[in-house]
């Protein structure tokens, strides 16, 4: 049976942990708000770029651009976006398990991974797949450079025929309590569907071929960028939820320990009183 001192020390320890988890929850909430603002700010550009690419790509076929080439085998590249830090529940684990299960069902045993985020890299290292490039702890100012490098690397391998398809894997941020593991095909590029029909004839200068060639890489880079924004928002939402649950659990544990302490102290006092009374009666 633990002593009263041991119980007091345990209560103090849990209270310190509760303060830490509560602070982490507030920090994650603030970061989540900033991530949501950044995601909303990127939406107009993404929508307009999607509209232009949709209009242009409808004019061309597979033979007009190698990025439209249909796969002839199952050689697969994967861009995996995860967080660098943990303490966010099953946020990263669920995503990694989803992509590995999907690859297994597709008969892919040795995909080429580019991992962005330490958690995904650590997970894939334990699998049969190959990591050809890893980016971890990327500061905000370096994200555009990393995106350009990742897209350029995978595009080069796809055009050279080393890969037949390239997948983008991330957790789509739906709401605070919902992050949906998502697998999208980056290459071959699947032209986005037009959101609305515009019957007006559009004049392009220079030629539509040149404009489409310049925009396709920008379009893919933007897909990766918006997915990264989703990952950031989802990470902070998952961590905020996890820390809220941890703070609540710590509070419940403190209440139980305090009750146990009070009962133990009362029992100790009662025992001492009985001993005193018994001693006085013997005199």
What does each model-found stretch correspond to?
Residues 1-283:
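C-terminal beta-strand-loop-alpha-helix "lid" module of Rossmann-like NAD(P)-dependent dehydrogenases
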């Amino acid at each position: 049976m633990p002593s009263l001192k041991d119980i007091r020390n345990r209560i103090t320890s849990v209270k310190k942990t509760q303060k830490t988890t509560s602070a982490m929850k507030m920090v994650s909430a603030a970061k989540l708000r900033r991530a949501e603002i950044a995601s909303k700010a990127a939406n107009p550009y993404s929508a307009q770029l999607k509209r232009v690419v949709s209009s242009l790509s409808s004019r061309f076929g597979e033979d007009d651009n190698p990025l439209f080439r249909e796969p002839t085998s199952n050689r697969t590249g994967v861009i995996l976006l995860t967080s660098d830090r943990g303490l966010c529940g099953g946020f990263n684990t669920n995503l990694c398990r989803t992509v590995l299960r999907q690859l297994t069902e597709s008969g892919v045993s040795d995909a080429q991974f580019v991992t962005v985020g330490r958690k995904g890299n650590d997970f894939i290292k334990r699998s049969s797949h190959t990591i050809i490039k890893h980016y971890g702890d990327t500061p905000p100012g370096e994200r555009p450079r990393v995106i350009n490098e990742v897209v350029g690397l995978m595009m080069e391998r796809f055009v050279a025929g080393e890969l037949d398809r390239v997948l983008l894997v991330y957790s789509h941020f739906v709401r605070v309590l919902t992050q949906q593991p998502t697998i999208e095909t980056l290459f071959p590029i699947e032209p986005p569907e037009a959101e609305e029909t515009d019957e007006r004839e559009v004049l392009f200068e220079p030629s539509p071929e040149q404009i489409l060639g310049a925009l396709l890489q920008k379009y893919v880079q933007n897909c990766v960028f918006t997915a990264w924004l989703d990952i950031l928002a989802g990470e902070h939402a998952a961590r905020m939820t996890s820390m809220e649950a941890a703070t609540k659990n710590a509070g419940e544990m403190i209440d139980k320990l305090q009750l146990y302490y009070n009962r133990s102290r009362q029992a100790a006092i009662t025992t001492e009183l009985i001993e005193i009374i018994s001693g006085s009666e013997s005199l």
